[in-house]
Amino acid sequence: MVADEDKVFKALADPSRRQLLDGLRRKNGQTLSELCEGHDMTRQAVTKHLNLLEEANLVATAKRGREKLHFLNPVPINEIYMRWIGKFEQGRVQALHNLKQALQEKDQ
């Protein structure tokens, strides 16, 4: 699990890869040519970044005839959210609830 998370963090560390993921979030199922159109990168650079995103399981692919379609896989990002962010969010929500109750009691 840790090795998989390391791959995800490494993949997300690069702004170009985050841009590719954002592009897939806006329009899922793009070809390499479509992904190249929206970015100021060479075809080879986009391919390299997509391969790393695939290794991190952030992008899944499917063949359609001669084309290879790329799809965003949000599961690894959600797993990181649940492990690293979700736990901290729970305390924050509880603190806001306690503050609300204290203010309501003060008004009474």
What are these regions, as identified by a protein language model?
Residues 50-51:
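Short, hydrophobic-biased segments on the C-terminal half of alpha helices
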Residues 3-42, 68-79, 83:
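N-terminal helix-turn-helix DNA-binding core of bacterial DNA-binding proteins
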Residues 10, 22, 54, 60, ...:
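A cross-family signal for key residues in well-ordered alpha-helices
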Residues 2-4, 25-26, 78-108:
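Amphipathic alpha-helical dimerization/coiled-coil segments
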Residues 54-65, 71:
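Beta-hairpin "wing" of winged helix-turn-helix
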